[in-house]
Regions:
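Aromatic-lined carbohydrate-binding/catalytic grooves of carbohydrate-active enzymes
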Residues: 1-83, 92, 100-110
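Conserved, mostly hydrophobic/aromatic
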Residues: 15, 137, 212, 281, ...
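Short, well-ordered coil/turn segments that N-cap beta-strands
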Residues: 18-20, 89-91, 131-135
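Glycan-recognition surfaces
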Residues: 39-76, 80, 118, 122-228
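Aromatic- and carboxylate-lined catalytic core of secreted/periplasmic carbohydrate-active enzymes
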Residues: 207-262
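Carbohydrate-binding surface patches
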Residues: 210-213, 217-218, 260-303
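Solvent-exposed beta-hairpin/edge-strand motifs
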Residues: 299-317
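C-terminal beta-strand-rich structural cap/linker in extracellular carbohydrate-active enzymes
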Residues: 320-343
Length: 343
C-alpha cells in the first residue's frame, strides 16, 4: 500500500536483474485501518458498506475488520490491486488473513450466500481468476479447506530463530504433515538465522524445520546495512547441498510416531521421509540444557531389521552403519539429519 506503481515496478526490475522472481504480500478480505468512511480502493464505496457485521457490530479478528468477499466493491478492490501486481510483473504472492473472509455475518451482499465459507469460496474464486494463472499463490492465516485456491499454505504462524521457534513450526508439521496431499506444498515460511544469543545448533534446527516441512524462505536482513553475522550464518547454513536437495523434493516429512509430544504446543522429535532409494530420518533436540539420546527401531522406519544400512548425517558429514536400529545423540538445541541408503 505504501509503494507507488513506479516503485513496485522498480523493485520487480531489481529482482529480475538479480536473476530472481519478485513476490508481494497482500490481504484481500481485511481493513486494517478500521476507517468506515475511507473509500474502498478502486471505488467510491465507503468501507462501512463492505464490512461484515454480526449482531450489527463489525466483525473483528486479530485487530482488523472483516470485509465481505461477495460485495461488488470488494471485487473491484481485488481488480484494482491484482492489476497493479500484474503491471509491475510480480509472479509470487502471499495472501494473508483470509480467515476474515470466512467469518459468519448477519448477511452478505449476495443474498444467496448464507454462510461464511460460501462467501469465502466466492471471493477466493474471484481472486484466483484475477491472478490469471500467472502467480504462485501461498496462503497464510486461512481456513484449511477449501484447499484448491493456492499452491501452498503456511503450516504455522510467525516464527523466528530460536529452538522454540523451530518447535513451534514443527508443532504444525507434527499434526499437519498430511496437508501436503491437499496443497502442492506445505510452507514453513520465513526462517531466521540471526538473533542475539542464537547458536549454530539452533540455526541447523531452524533450517531443517523448514526443509522437512516442504518449502521455505529466508527472512534475515541481508541488505548492505544488515548485520554481518546474519549474512555469514545464511551463507553457511543455507548452502548445504544435501540439505537443500531434500527441500527440492517438496514433500512433508511425517512423524515417526505421531503421539509423543510432551504437552500442548510441543512437537514430535523424530520425522521420516521415505524415497525410492533412501530414507531420511531427522532427530530434533528441543532442550537447551541436555543432549538427547535416541534409538529408533528399523521397523518404525520401514527398514528391514535383518539388514545393515549405510547412513550419512548430512550436517556433519559423518558416515555410520546401523543394524536393527538407528541410534544417536543430539546436542542441546540442535538436530541430526540422517540419509540412509536402502540399496
Amino acid at each position: 500500500d505504501n509503494f507507488s506503481d513506479e516503485q513496485l515496478k522498480e523493485f520487480v526490475d531489481h529482482c529480475h536483474r538479480n536473476g530472481q522472481k519478485a513476490g508481494i504480500y497482500w490481504v484481500p478480505f481485511t481493513d486494517w485501518f478500521r476507517d468506515p468512511e475511507r473509500k474502498v480502493e478502486g471505488t467510491d464505496t465507503p468501507y462501512r458498506e463492505v464490512y461484515l457485521y454480526a449482531n450489527g457490530k463489525e466483525q473483528s479478528l486479530d485487530g482488523a475488520w472483516a470485509i465481505d468477499p461477495t460485495h461488488p466493491a470488494v471485487k473491484k478492490r481485488i481488480d484494482y490491486f491484482t492489476e497493479r501486481f500484474h503491471r509491475a510483473g510480480f509472479e509470487y504472492i502471499k495472501i494473508d488473513f483470509l480467515t476474515h473472509g470466512a467469518m459468519e455475518a448477519d448477511s452478505h451482499a449476495d443474498p444467496n450466500v448464507t454462510t461464511g465459507i460460501q462467501a469465502y469460496n466466492q471471493g477466493m474464486k474471484y481472486l484466483l481468476d484475477a491472478f490469471k494463472g500467472k502467480f504462485y499463490i501461498t496462503q497464510a492465516i486461512s481456513p484449511v479447506f477449501p484447499s484448491h485456491y493456492a499452491h501452498s499454505r503456511r503450516i504455522a504462524c510467525d516464527a523466528f530463530a530460536a529452538i522454540t521457534d523451530s518447535e513451534y513450526t514443527l508443532n504444525g508439521l507434527s499434526y499437519g504433515w498430511w496437508l501436503c496431499n491437499a496443497y502442492r506444498f506445505n510452507d514453513a515460511d520465513h526462517l531466521l538465522m540471526f538473533r542475539e544469543g542464537i547458536t549454530e545448533g539452533e540455526n541447523r534446527a531452524r533450517v531443517t524445520s523448514g526443509v522437512i516441512t516442504g518449502i521455505y524462505m529466508n527472512g534475515d536482513d541481508l541488505t548492505l546495512a544488515g548485520p554481518k553475522v546474519a549474512k555469514e550464518r545464511v551463507k553457511k547454513f543455507f548452502t548445504n547441498a544435501e540439505i537443500n536437495r531434500i527441500a527440492r523434493i517438496g514433500r512433508s516429512f511425517r512423524p515417526v510416531y505421531g503421539y509423543r509430544p510432551t504437552a500442548n504446543g510441543r512437537a514430535e522429535n523424530f520425522f521420516v521421509l521415505e524415497q525410492e532409494q533412501v530414507v531420511y530420518v531427522v532427530a530434533f533436540n528441543f532442550a537447551k540444557d541436555r543432549p538427547l539420546e535416541y534409538t529408533l527401531a528399523f521397523s518404525d522406519l520401514n527398514l528391514d531389521p535383518a539388514r545393515t544400512y549405510s547412513a550419512t548425517e548430512l550436517w556433519s558429514g559423518v558416515n555410520e552403519e546401523f543394524t536393527m536400529e538407528l541410534k544417536g545423540q543430539v546436542p542441546p538445541a540442535d538436530v541430526q539429519v540422517w540419509k540412509i541408503k536402502k540399496l
